[in-house]
């Protein structure tokens, strides 16, 4: 797992550690010291810790003017044992909401498992706080999406179908946002 790095193709235009509005502002990254692990397996040091034992993230891009962010996730999303949505919501999302972000894209190709909970308070709260924005998940494994459906996470997070963008790394973040916004608008019948 230590070889799986967060995407870095946009570091020339955005780095969360250099963004004063980011919850990870001022963070420094060692390329030689591995300090975090998931179930005893060390993970790459560029992933940001959110106080979860099994879920990490990386804010890849945020545009405060257009009010969107793209966040890559890594690990096991475990709401059953660790209430990971609480950690993600309180330690990352709330900071971005306070800065006016209302469009959230979660990249999930490195989320290896999801364990849901009947409690959906944090999802519901987040959904209500984006008001006329949206929350979307792209490139999550099909079995993760099925678990999301089982626990009704699809009430709050848009995912699946044409929201899976396997070529996302080759696109500029603005184009990803515009594409997803168009898809969501079409799904809601606004186009």
Regions of interest found by a model, annotated:
Residues 4-11, 143-191:
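A cross-taxonomic marker for long C-terminal extensions/tails that follow the last structured domain
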Residues 101-104, 108-152:
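Amphipathic alpha-helical interaction surfaces in cytosolic regulatory modules
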